[in-house]
From Swiss-Prot:
It comes from Dictyostelium discoideum. It holds the Pfam family IBN_N. SUPFAM superfamilies: ARM repeat. InterPro entries: ARM-like, ARM-type_fold, Importin-beta_N, Importin_beta-like_NTR. Forms a complex with an importin alpha subunit. This is Importin-13 homolog B. GO terms for biological process: protein import into nucleus.
Length: 1119
């Protein structure tokens, strides 16, 4: 903005010196001192709308009448309804009215009234929030006169801020910050000083850091000013205001930054007992400014640290009364701690530490930072020990801890000598050894990113090793199960992981349902801490075996000392488990040691055994080469499967072992023995436990290694009990438990198809057994289970979980047992079709899709054709039924309340009114059932490209018509838009003749489908016109979404290739129509260039998309 334009801001702050008294007393606070005109004070309304005020962003909302009209009483009632009413409909109406009110121009007038003319908190807070929102979103659209009024309003409010609750003061401070960011320094030249002067009774240049008695504050306004100064640097770092000139602000701030620091430091000299809250906020502001911009020289930075340390160590007397404003929330805390500003001091140092790296640090800066670090090393250990050991106060300990984390995170080798780094690390170790779980969690970010901290990585490896082992040792302590819980200790000799192969698990662990899960915060800490140290291990910061060796030695030492606390053993085993993942390089040598010492642990408990079991599952790489250990481990795992608290971990570990090809091969000779031991568990109470599925998978992996002639009887023995468990639930289950049991049994069935593959038995020996798929050992399994699953589909037609299980079974069957499945495809097809027609579910379409392959039997082709016809009819009717039930009323409401985009779409073309009647015959909302739409279109597309003889040609053209006429409604759901556009693109591409099918009959049908598509556009030119019109409208009106625009571009390109003459005819007429997108005010040259580009049918997809995207951007950028 030029200088002449600035002259129009006659009521804005002056650009020269600002008279403090005039600023404080003037009823129009932003009036220049030389201008005594007070006509702007209009009937007590602080912010009166100029007559020519226009808000471009909210034209739509301004056109919508606000009923009832806004008054203080109406606003009070609306807010009371929103927060207090029990009627949800009334709350929604109140919310809608309040949102609409906030977007009205009149809201500017009400904001100061809500803040200053009421004492109702909800009204005041709503006024503050509304003012903030309007300023952030509407400032750039306001004219000069309006901006002047807004600035006057804001300053009038802050002059009266003593009447506001503290949370409202904060919101108004944010508003003031936004106003300053928009106006400083071009419009409001002295904004920072003007605001600071609200809280001092002297010129800022006369403030003294050497003689605080010369400083005089206006404490009534000090809180607002300090809040503003604490918020401004954070908002400047975010840089999220449009059209805000951040570089200009930063340039100007560099000239005055020392005075800002001087003011904030002078506040610290106020008597602490009476001004505690002011001092706290001043520390907060100092921290924020140190993160954003350091003082101009090291001397001021040194003073900042010195004063902060001096004041931060002051002790508050027991009769402290706060700041005089009645805010005594922290008094009790201050009295009990004695040094209440230590955490504030830490906050300042933390802020400064973020500036150590990346600053142009001269020697003066380095000396100031070194002073801060040396002082921190001296004073903080005492306060940290007091906070953690004596008071157990994390709120005080965490900021101190984080100061040193931030210090050593900075890569400033000029500041941090090797000796200084070692001192910081040693101090951190002492903090870690007594720190709480929450406090030492602050190290996670540093450890995660440790490799990037060159200064730390280059330290002596022995020092780093010592540091990380100390850290791990503390992790063990703070991640133990809490003391005092009864976890049912286990008697010696009943451990499921004893080395004796004859050990029995007789239920001594627990007879009652005792919760043995970790607290969430401990579990999360374990996960994060182990991940961090794994990064250290994997990045070779220390030798890979360091942690594992330390843990095993510690475990062995505890065993030798006969430590009586199972929690300590369990914690060690957890971290061994965590470090046993990954590549396991150099770890396998420790496995036999662990397998031998774990049974020697003198005390057992359920959590301890569970962790031991989980650990064993990590060592399949070792077990696959050691038959004896493998047999012992599996034998010891099996008894744990009978215990509800252990079956999950035991089943998971067993599966981890059995998925190893070598382990399952080694276990196959013992299959009968294993099954003998497990069978009572499979048939007992645990059969409804979801973990039992993992047990079946483990056994199937072993059975997978059986010779073909031995497979059938063992498979039958394993799976046959599952069948009655399923048939017992037909027709329907009566309880949730029975329902869950049914899901478990169905999961077992599809595990068979997942693990055992037919292809592995296709090639037999010289005798040529099983040349027919019907003689395969699993053929009877499918003969039995497929009819049962058909019954389940009938009786559980709306149960998604059960349908998904059956779908998974059939899909795996088609994938891995196609030779066998060919005998059952017609039955499976009938089941899926009937079920879909009864209750449409997307996954049922996936079953039919899995059946489609290039070569099918004639009967199967006929059945699929009939199925697709029925499914298509059901699909269309389902969408129509929803439309008939809800769309008529909703559409009328949408047409009334819709945004300008949709209103303009309806007015852009004279012919569009005629299209409405045509569209009414084809109204469908494909986004109502996005999953069904997706799987239906995938199914039809697969048939089109694989076996077109499986579909009636008119189905393709019918679906295309429905999509064409509803293209403009698709954009509310991007995935559905993509699916529909891809289908339409494939269908339109048929005319280019590139799609060919190996089956001659398929090609004939494909030709018929192509003729249907041609006839579709030739019989009625409106169809092709609507296609082109809707595509162009979406391109022009869709917000700049690259993905959506590309979908429409591909449809247009396929139409350009297949039907170039129709595209030229319609696109030319539409784009040359002056009423088309008239409100966009598009340059005719841009329209013509776009038309030329989209008619190039020989363009590549990339070039075509680029042309469409460019025009879409032009259209949407003009809004």
């Amino acid at each position: 903005m030029n200088t002449n334009a600035m002259d129009q801001y006659e009521n804005c702050p002056s650009y020269g010196s600002f008279d403090v008294k005039s600023f404080s007393d003037s009823p129009i606070p932003f009036t220049n001192n030389n201008n005594n005109n007070n006509n702007n004070n209009n009937n007590n309304s602080i912010c009166v709308m100029p007559s020519n005020y226009n808000n471009k962003n909210n034209n739509n909302n301004n056109n919508e009448k606000l009923e009832p009209e806004a008054t203080l009483d109406v606003l009070t009632h609306a807010l009371h309804t929103l927060y207090k009413s029990n009627d949800s409909n009334q709350r929604k109406l109140a919310e809608k009215w309040l949102i609409l009110f906030q977007k009205q121009p009149i809201a500017w007038e009400f904001c100061p009234r809500l803040l200053l003319e009421t004492n109702i908190f909800e009204l005041q807070y709503f006024g503050a929030s509304t003012l903030e929102s309007k300023l952030k979103n509407e400032w750039n659209e306001c004219n000069v006169e309006m901006k002047s009024k807004i600035l006057n309003t804001i300053v009038s409010i802050i002059q009266n801020s003593t009447k506001l609750p503290i949370c409202c003061v904060t919101r108004v401070s944010v508003t003031l910050t936004i106003a300053v960011m928009y106006t400083f320094p071009e419009i409001w030249r002295n904004a920072i000083f003007d605001i600071i002067h609200l809280s001092i009774k002297q010129d800022i240049n006369t403030l003294s850091l050497h003689d605080p008695s010369q400083n005089h504050f206006n404490t009534d306004r000090l809180l607002m000013v300090l809040e503003f100064l604490s918020i401004l640097p954070d908002e400047l770092k975010k840089q999220d205001l449009a059209l805000c000139k951040y570089s200009e602000i930063q340039k100007e701030l560099k000239l005055i930054i020392d005075k800002i620091y001087k003011f904030l430091l002078s506040v610290l000299f106020l008597p602490i007992n009476e001004n505690f809250e002011f001092i706290k906020i001043s520390y907060k502001a100092l921290s924020a400014w140190l993160k954003y911009m350091l003082p101009s020289n090291g001397t001021m930075l040194q003073s900042c640290f010195e004063i902060s340390f001096t004041v931060g160590q002051q002790k508050v007397s027991n009769n402290s009364n706060g700041n005089g404003n009645g805010n005594n929330n922290n008094n009790n805390n201050r009295n009990s701690i004695g040094y209440p500003l230590i955490d504030s001091l830490a906050l300042v140092l933390e802020g400064s530490s973020l500036s150590i790296e990346g600053q142009s640090n001269g020697s003066c800066y380095i000396e100031a930072f070194r002073y801060a670090i040396e002082q921190s090393l001296t004073i903080f250990p005492t306060f940290y020990n007091e906070a953690t050991v004596m008071n157990q106060d994390d709120s005080k300990a965490k900021p101190i801890f984080n100061v040193f984390v931030q210090f050593i995170s900075s890569n400033n080798s000029q500041l941090f000598t090797t000796d200084l780094i070692h001192r910081c690390l040693n101090l951190l170790i002492s903090f870690i050894e007594i720190g709480s779980r929450e406090t030492i969690s602050l190290l996670f970010y540093l450890i995660d990113d440790f490799k990037t901290h060159t200064m730390l990585v280059q330290q002596d490896q022995n020092i780093l090793k010592f540091f990380f082992l100390k850290l791990l040792n503390r992790f063990l302590d703070v991640s133990m199960y809490p003391n005092g819980k009864d976890y049912c200790p286990i008697e010696n000799g009943t451990n499921p992981l004893s080395t004796s192969q004859n050990a029995q698990f007789n239920g001594v662990l627990c007879e009652t349902n005792i919760e043995t899960l970790l607290d969430d915060d401990i579990e999360q800490f374990r996960s994060c801490s182990s991940d961090c140290l794994m990064n250290i291990q994997e990045n070779d910061i220390i030798p890979k075996s360091t942690f594992l060796k330390f843990l095993i030695e510690k475990l062995n030492a505890f065993i030798n000392e006969k430590c009586p606390h199972w929690e300590q053993y369990e914690s060690i085993l957890y971290y061994i488990y965590a470090f046993s993942g990954g590549s396991q390089d150099g770890q396998l040598e420790y496995v036999p040691i662990l397998l031998n010492i774990i049974p020697l642990i003198p005390i057992k408990s359920i959590p301890l055994v569970r962790t031991s079991i989980k650990l064993i599952g990590r060592y399949s790489s070792f077990l696959k080469t050691n038959t004896d250990y493998l047999a012992k481990v599996v034998s010891d795992l099996l008894p744990a499967l009978s215990h509800a608290e252990l079956i999950g971990s035991a089943a998971s570990s067993l599966l981890s072992i059995c998925v190893s090809d070598k382990c399952s091969t080694m276990l196959w000779p013992h299959f009968n023995q294993i099954l003998d031991q497990i069978e009572p568990i499979l048939l007992g109470p645990q059969k409804s436990n979801p973990s039992i599925v993992l047990v079946y998978k483990s056994l199937l992996h072993i059975l997978h290694k059986a010779p073909i002639h031995e497979l059938s009887p063992l498979f039958t023995r394993l799976i046959s009990p599952v069948i009655p468990n399923i048939t017992d639930h037909i027709p329907r289950v009566k309880s949730k438990d029975h329902y869950n049991q049914l899901l478990v049994q169905l999961s077992i069935l599809y595990s068979v198809n997942e693990i055992i593959e037919y292809d592995e038995f296709a090639t037999m020996g010289a005798n040529g057994e099983f040349t027919s798929p019907s003689k395969h050992p699993l053929y009877p399994f499918f003969q039995t289970t497929i009819p049962i699953q058909g019954q389940l589909l009938k009786h559980y037609k709306s149960e998604f979980e059960i349908i998904d299980c059956i779908t998974t079974f059939y899909r795996y069957m088609m994938l891995y047992f196609r030779e066998i499945a060919n005998d059952f495809v017609d039955e499976i097809l009938q089941q899926a079709t009937q079920s879909f027609n009864q209750y449409p579910i997307a996954s049922l379409l996936q079953i039919i899709s899995s059946i489609i392959i290039p070569k099918l039997q004639p009967l199967t082709i006929t059945n699929i054709k009939n199925s697709i016809s029925l499914i298509s009819n059901t699909f269309i009717n389902t969408l129509k039924s929803v439309i008939l039930a809800t769309n008529n009323n909703n559409k009328n409401n949408d047409n009334t309340n819709n945004n300008d985009d949709n209103n303009n779409k309806n007015d852009n073309n004279n012919n569009n009114n005629n299209n409405d009647n045509d569209k009414s015959n084809f109204i469908l909302d494909f986004t109502i059932t996005p999953d069904i739409t997706k799987d239906y279109l995938i199914l039809i597309t697969k048939i089109l490209k694989t076996s077109p003889q499986c579909i009636e040609p008119n189905i393709i053209s019918t679906i295309c018509i429905y999509i064409i006429y509803n293209l403009t409604d698709l954009t509310k759901d991007k995935p559905t838009t993509g699916n529909c556009c891809l289908f339409l693109t494939n269908c339109l591409s048929l005319n280019n003749g590139k799609l060919q099918i190996s089956d001659p009959n398929g090609n004939k049908v494909l030709e018929q489908i192509k003729n249907e598509m041609n006839a579709l556009f030739e019989s009625d030119p409106k169809h092709s016109y609507v296609l082109v019109y809707n595509i162009l409208m979406n391109i022009c009106w869709t917000p700049t979404s690259i993905q959506v625009t590309q979908h429409f571009s591909d449809v247009l390109l396929s139409f350009a290739i297949g039907y170039p003459n129709l595209l030229k005819l319609h696109a030319t007429n539409i784009l040359n129509d002056p009423n088309f997108i008239k409100d966009k005010q598009i340059n005719p040259h841009d329209k013509q260039s776009f038309l030329t580009n989209i008619l190039k049918s020989n363009s590549t997809q990339v070039d075509y998309r680029s042309s469409v995207r460019t025009f879409s951007f032009i259209c949407n950028d003009k809004e």
